[in-house]
Amino acid sequence: MLPALKYLGKTVSVTMDRPLGSRHPKYGFVYKANYGFLPGTVSGDGEEIDAYVLNIDRPLQNYTGKCTAVIHRTDDNDDKLIIIPQEDEISDLEIETQTAFQEKWFKHIIIRKIPAIHLICGFIGFGKTTYAKRLEQELPAVRFTHDEIMCARYGRSPEDFPEKYKLIDKEIRRDAAAEISRGHNVILDYGFWSKKKRQAYYRWARQLTPEVCFHVLRCDLNTAKERVLKRNADNLNELFIDENAFNILLQQYEPLSEEENYPAVFISSPPLSD
């Protein structure tokens, strides 16, 4: 996660090295807002985290206020906190307007919330991808579905399945980390059948963001099997799993229980006719 994001919503103290009305030492433009840094912090560029103090119309030396947003420069790995008075609110448009004197030269995005990773958990046929697609629109988020990518790249019944799956998983982890760094929510529609896999993924996800949650799909196994056999015939864009494979894979499935003590929501999958 971007170092600056941990300050979102918190009260911070800023030391101004370029107060309102001062000029940039190299380029000469006038600072139309107070601009400073958080002492003792480290940003993505190795220097102290910078901050704009907005909605204040006088030069400042020091200021304590709330961090309401982060400007993330996508082309130079630099971030700027947006600090305003505790009682104030500010829109993205107002942030853009008040910081344009400097930020107009950089590609950037405004981040308001710490991005989250949502881990979709459940066995084959439990409705994980249907649920993940809905969540993708609601949040919004960037969704990664392992089986979808596998099928598109290698077909419905790929040879050397475990090795290819590991390659896909490595790519997804890389791309998911990049999306989190851009402030985007991420959905991993993977299944997470075993306790060991859940532990490993949870540790990895927590290294990227403190906001990690399992979404646990529950479903009657007969309904799940019926769904899988039906989509084998109806959907050529799904991995092919016959009844024998379903039964064998079921032996590997360890349902997530509340005793595992992960942040989780539990969802009952609707019947097949829904």
Tell where the protein language model's regions lie, with residue ranges:
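Pre-Walker A (Motif I) flank of P-loop NTPase domains
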Residues: 114-118, 182-184
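Conserved GTP-binding G-domain of TRAFAC-class P-loop NTPases and closely related GTPase folds
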Residues: 117, 121, 126, 133-134, ...
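Glycine-rich phosphate-binding loop used to anchor ATP phosphates in small-molecule kinases
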Residues: 163-212
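Hydrophobic N-terminal alpha-helices or hydrophobic patches in metabolic proteins across all domains
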Residues: 1-113
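Conserved substrate/cofactor phosphate-moiety recognition/catalytic segment
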Residues: 126, 130-184
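Amphipathic alpha-helical transducer elements in NTP-driven molecular machines
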Residues: 166-169, 173, 218, 243-250
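A structural preference for long, well-packed, hydrophobic secondary-structure segments
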Residues: 120-126, 134-135, 160, 195-199, ...
